[in-house]
């Protein structure tokens, strides 16, 4: 198919999908018939012709006024079939693309596809795991017989190798249904969500949710499927597991921030402390702590004894790691791009086993590799990365010394790696299996060389309650609150605000309203933030935190009278805080209540005599009230202690108003050492003119300063 035909097919597909979304079935059928003709899809063209004729007859009977109680049900069937045919034609179009990874892989499997059907695809045929994976991923929508055969196969008892093959099959079904919706595969995933095997159940549940996020609009057309989902939600343990999945999906939103934080924030801090020591920017948290310990550096404090940024990073990332966040994306990114092993899609989803045909035989008996795989919280593809990396290193590097150090770093026992993998229990909890699989899926979607051929669910809205029927199944206030708190911890402010907003207002706590207000602040919704803080204050009066947020918002909005009320209450709760006294003074100055402002400023100066902030404010207040000699006295103190450009500018005003224009010019020039601005007096023109200077005086002073 050439580019012109490809563009036409894509245009017709988009037109058909839009018509279906707009409930214009006849227009959709016309576009689909055009697609079928272009793609030379004879069977689809014939069915579309029959469907169009049947719909014409239905419309004809309706126009004649004929009573037909089944008319609406028939119309829904026509719509569903039109959606299914649009998917079938979309797949045909993809296969006709000469350069697409989907089509290229499909053509490579041609010998295996001879006489192929879904029933013959069952693993008894003796195909390799990779061939099975590709055949399933590339499979057409299942027929009823194929769906039944696969459903039976998944419920057959199996040993470990058969279980791994079944897990691969579930992942392949997931990728297939994500790309081209197939209700039969979706139903299989629903049934497998009740599997007693943890690995299989995790993959089925993740697959079900990913397919649903992408194709929720299709699912609603299948009442039997919606009913199954509702029954599934009532199954024992399902809601707890779906909540764990939701939390893990939220954590994936942090992966990029963690990767950037480790490389751009934490590592520069460590490098600064390590000075001469060389560090690799892909070190893990424990390795960073070890390096700091070796250098006799305390990560909690700076050299002057103040809390360090590094301590904050370590605590934040350690908490994220404990909750199951992906801390190793950056570490394994280069490895996965280096080994041909990861150019094969199936290998990203292959449950870890030393019996994988591409893993060196001696890796299984290497105690260091065994210890790493057991002790570190790694997804399956990361474990394969370790095995492949180890196979390239000299034997002495992976010996007992390294094993002992790794055991100490992971807080484990080095003897755990001495027994072969097969003799150790491999059962994982649902949460562990879920973390591993979601992280592995995330890596595939972001690192696989042909990732553009697959739909990336992590780019979608990850909150399940935004999609029917989960919007009616996951509406409990406690669930929404827990999810909102998780999003808040992850600094996903917009998501957290949306979740808090969905909660029943009467059931929200003061703390949740506080967090809702903070999220609204972070996303620029100032009015929403004010409303949330006011509600929190009414539910829990005299909260210092709430009052500070409210006061800051009122102040930033220029409502200084309301801000003043908040600061006065704060001052009564914490009378010894210099910052509160300064804020009180600021509000009083804006309200032209200068006598009160001076009282607050003298108190701030008494509470914090070493700070120049009260001096600056006192100088400015004296300037505003015409007490220029006192203003000058305080500006001299300010100028003696690391003055800012604003300090030099305001001190220039004081000198000029005291009748010392020479000193004023020098100070003005120091306020603008790099680039002189001819408008530097504009902001304070009213103050200067109120003191008796004319517009001409300001113009001449501007020229005197700028013409050096």
Feature annotation, model-predicted:
Residues 479, 512, 546, 580, ...:
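TPR alpha-solenoid repeat register
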Residues 348-545, 549-552:
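Alpha-solenoid helical-repeat scaffolds
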Residues 35-38, 206-234, 640-643, 653-679, ...:
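TPR/TPR-like (Sel1-like) alpha-helical repeat modules
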Residues 37, 501-505, 534-538, 568-572, ...:
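Conserved structural position within tetratricopeptide repeats
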